[in-house]
Curated annotation (Swiss-Prot):
A Pfam family assignment: ribosomal_L24
One Gene Ontology MF term: rRNA binding
Protein name, as recorded: Large ribosomal subunit protein uL24
Native source species: Orientia tsutsugamushi (strain Ikeda) (Rickettsia tsutsugamushi)
Database matches in Gene3D superfamilies: 2.30.30.30
Main function: One of two assembly initiator proteins, it binds directly to the 5'-end of the 23S rRNA, where it nucleates assembly of the 50S subunit. One of the proteins that surrounds the polypeptide exit tunnel on the outside of the subunit.
Xref: InterPro entries: KOW, Rib_uL2_dom2, Ribosomal_uL24, Ribosomal_uL24_CS, Ribosomal_uL24_KOW, Translation_prot_SH3-like_sf
Gene that specifies this protein: rplX
Family: Belongs to the universal ribosomal protein uL24 family.
Oligomeric and partner information: Part of the 50S ribosomal subunit.
An individual GO BP term: translation
Keywords: Ribonucleoprotein, Ribosomal protein, RNA-binding, rRNA-binding
Stored SUPFAM superfamilies: Translation proteins SH3-like domain
Length: 105
C-alpha cells in the first residue's frame, strides 16, 4: 500500500493514461485502494434505471477512481507538478511541504 500524500481538495494533474495532462480537484481519497477520484477526470457513461419514486432513468457521466501513482500534486505558487514531503514544525505538528517551492501546503 502506497503512502497517500494527496488530500481531498488538492489540485492534481494526471501524469499517465487516457487523461494525461488534465488537471482537476480531488473529490475523494480511497486510501484502502490507493486511489483518488478527481472532478472531471476519468469519466465513464453509466446507465441508470428509472426509479418508482419518480427518478428518471438515462445515461449519466460519472468519475471513476484513478490510482494514486498516476496523479501528481500541482504546486499553487509555481503552477507545476511537484512531490510532497512531510516535516515537523517545532517538533510537534506534522505538515506537508512542496519539494519544488518549499512552501507549507
Amino acid at each position: 500500500m502506497l503512502k497517500i500524500r494527496i488530500k481531498t481538495g488538492d489540485q492534481v494533474q494526471v501524469i499517465t493514461g487516457k487523461d494525461k495532462g488534465k488537471r482537476g480537484i480531488v473529490i475523494k481519497v480511497l486510501a484502502n485502494l490507493s486511489k483518488v477520484i478527481v472532478k472531471g477526470i476519468n469519466l465513464a457513461q453509466k446507465h441508470v434505471k428509472a426509479n418508482k419514486n419518480g427518478v428518471s432513468g438515462g445515461i449519466i457521466s460519472k468519475e471513476l477512481p484513478i490510482h494514486i501513482s498516476n496523479v501528481a500534486y500541482v504546486d499553487s505558487s509555481s503552477n507545476l507538478i511537484t512531490k510532497i514531503t512531510y516535516t515537523k514544525l517545532d517538533g510537534k505538528r506534522k505538515v506537508r511541504i512542496s519539494k519544488r517551492s518549499g512552501e507549507i501546503l
